[in-house]
């Protein structure tokens, strides 16, 4: 195996090799002899651009003799500059695998932000060990390696057979078998999987492809993400259960804002929910109705709707102001069309307070216990619509709703469709192993995700550790920012912020 002609020509300089022979560096390090027939050519990413073959040789040689190193360089630069990745071939397969186990996702080189990425080059994948290695489960603990070889040798040449044993040297009831080709391994699976129940086993024999390193990392990340999302859900549910006492506090703030006409302190709420002074006044009145409903629901008042109805009568809207015969029900219908309650609830869900959600829940409960009387059917219908609109924002705290949403939004992974202004997020500091599905699952609890994309380096085929998520509304985006910005995954904390508009020079 020789250095490809495309390798960049550098000045010839003599390098002293560990075996005492001299060798020239001409874009790669070559030896006069050849590597083993089963040697693996490895791709290595996340290396400093300033490193040459000499520094890389010093990095790899502790794991075995190096046959060849080829740094990928950008020919458009003069002189050509390293792309931060290379190919390395050891003399033995064992040395390559030992280097991968010691370096991949473990060692971070000076000046780099992410650990080394080391895997078989694309040219090696056609016959990679991981594609020919089988896991054999439900094996009798009385079997040894020879018994397993005899059992699987009819399907082709076996390169390796190993039974997993505990510290005491006893079999754990499973084994690994590596064939010479993938076709042999596939034939063994078809013929042997669940074909018999061996002595001392409770289930038929299991024959399948062994988990790859990527499978193991993906499963570890999924478990870690599931644990962290469970913690987030638990914290959110704790906030939801204690919302009853928040209504009076925020009712006072809203009343103060509407009575003083000085809404400067609430500018953030206005911008987030798109509210004007009239809408804030409506919200304050509705909160008062919620408080009255909470009181009347626990009292023996024969007509608990009276105080609530009087409070609802004060609701105003552009429609009600221009129509002399408008009723409280009409005012409520116009209020629901404004989306005010949904905006405020969505902006605060799962964080410190969800006063709008609590108010609507109390109001819905108080009215629902009394039935539809005295012409309040229109009002009840409007309240039900408003409350139903808010319920979607509690999905972050309800695992069942989360699971349903997961099934509905799988098509969003990998797409790059943009949502409305203010609904598109930029996420940085993603783990190297995260893909489109991982980022989708992480941000789905906060609303309807229409696209989720992790960006990949076209040269190295590795994640750039950032991506974009788009919702169908700005409220969900704000909820995701407040909940996930600074959220820790492994050793990193996510950076979540709004994606800049197309008018800006940079997307983030």
Swiss-Prot record:
Keywords: Cytoplasm, mRNA processing, Nucleus, Repeat, Repressor, RNA-binding
SUPFAM superfamilies: RNA-binding domain, RBD
Region (Necessary for RNA-binding, TNNT2 exon 5 and NMDA R1 exon 21 inclusion): 1-283, 357-508
Start and end residues of each RRM domain: 40-123, 132-212, 423-501
Stored SMART domains: RRM (SM00360)
Tissues of expression: Strongly expressed in forebrain regions, including the cerebral cortex and hippocampus. Moderately expressed in hindbrain regions, including the cerebellum and spinal cord.
Classification via PROSITE patterns: RRM (PS50102)
Tagged with keyword Nucleus: yes
Domain of life: Eukaryota
GO (cellular component) term, any one: cytoplasm
Pfam families: RRM_1 (PF00076)
GO biological process, one term: regulation of alternative mRNA splicing, via spliceosome
Entry similarity comment: Belongs to the CELF/BRUNOL family.
Role of this protein: RNA-binding protein implicated in the regulation of several post-transcriptional events. Involved in pre-mRNA alternative splicing, mRNA translation and stability. Mediates exon inclusion and/or exclusion in pre-mRNA that are subject to tissue-specific and developmentally regulated alternative splicing. Specifically activates exon 5 inclusion of TNNT2 in embryonic, but not adult, skeletal muscle. Activates TNNT2 exon 5 inclusion by antagonizing the repressive effect of PTB.
Subunit structure: Interacts with A1CF.
Protein name (record): CUGBP Elav-like family member 2
Organism for this UniProt entry: Rattus norvegicus
Highest classification ranks of the organism: Eukaryota, Metazoa, Chordata, Craniata, Vertebrata
